[in-house]
């Protein structure tokens, strides 16, 4: 039995969906433990592409149980739409194999209105590039102890009272600060309950489900969303998400003790990407950056926004290792680098006149660093057909081993293409 946490080591979009899909074969239960539908996992199965925003990608594997933990914020409308879409494609979406924690907080219609109004109201330099999905405002209400939880859907009077109380404050903001029309409490209640009727059968005690699985000797895979450097505490604040994306939150966001987590896999893209605003020291605003963007199909699964591209940043990776304690690394999109004569790796920053090995912790400090690069030979070979470590060209292996050396973490999986079987185990 193995309990594995999969988390992103950069700014998200590292290719977690494919790796989770691969590891799901070896797991019995898959748990999503944080974030909301601001993240998207793209999974390619044969000729069919699935984009999942809330439901764990393990749902595509027959016989696997998928759980949504208390650390997630869930939009009932999006959840119901995702269920309908997957069911239409022949996926079993019964409550016996998909469950939501009763403690999971719900993204309400007023959260989305507030998120979008707040971002639109900011001056250009203050915008953080939110997806406008209501994630942040939902987490705000959770911390303020005024949020709506999934269990409230089964208690209509409690739900109605929470909505009415929330709109006293939210409508004051909408009308007084943002010039928006107020929301009607009855209309919000009816909208939420319409989706809630479909959602209630999926409610469960997720913590107990996981512990029961362990008691039966089954293995659990904890599926993270986004990436370490979008973490609310440890990321490039304020250009971050509203939850903890580091491996430690797998326990808190699922209702299990951290001593049960025995393997942590950090997903690392072979180059670096970022969506939206925020510092990006190794960003390439040139032909090489465009090459990576086009060849890597770097468009956000959730927003469709073009991802910014740059060289691999080992400073960021060192910090990720320090924060997450990974047992091993899965390196993705290595095939995208084929065709480049030289490849650069950022091994340090110059910050305030000194060379540093870790990111500065001051707000906006990352915007004022100069990357220090080392350059190694690239390769022209098409590696998408390679199936073993030995079959990879020497320059490819040298690049992988250099990343391993810099991070001090073994690279156990190397992805050389989007398909499930285009993955090399070491």
From Swiss-Prot:
Binding-site residues, IMP: 13-16, 38-41, 131, 145, 226, 241, 305
Details of cofactor binding: Binds 1 Mg(2+) ion per subunit.
Metabolic or biological pathway, per its Swiss-Prot or TrEMBL entry: Purine metabolism; AMP biosynthesis via de novo pathway; AMP from IMP: step 1/2
CDD domains per record: AdSS
Enzyme Commission number(s) of this protein: 6.3.4.4
GO MF annotation: an example: GTP binding
Residues at which substrate binds: 301-307
Top-level EC class: ligase
Annotated disulfide bonds: none
Superkingdom of origin: Bacteria
Residues bound to Mg(2+): 13, 40
Entry-linked PROSITE patterns: ADENYLOSUCCIN_SYN_1, ADENYLOSUCCIN_SYN_2
Binding site for GTP: 12-18, 40-42, 307, 333-335, 415-417
Active site feature: 13, 41
Subunit relationships: Homodimer.
PANTHER family: ADENYLOSUCCINATE SYNTHETASE
Family: Belongs to the adenylosuccinate synthetase family.
Function: Plays an important role in the de novo pathway of purine nucleotide biosynthesis. Catalyzes the first committed step in the biosynthesis of AMP from IMP.
Name of protein: Adenylosuccinate synthetase
Native species: Nitratidesulfovibrio vulgaris (strain ATCC 29579 / DSM 644 / CCUG 34227 / NCIMB 8303 / VKM B-1760 / Hildenborough) (Desulfovibrio vulgaris)
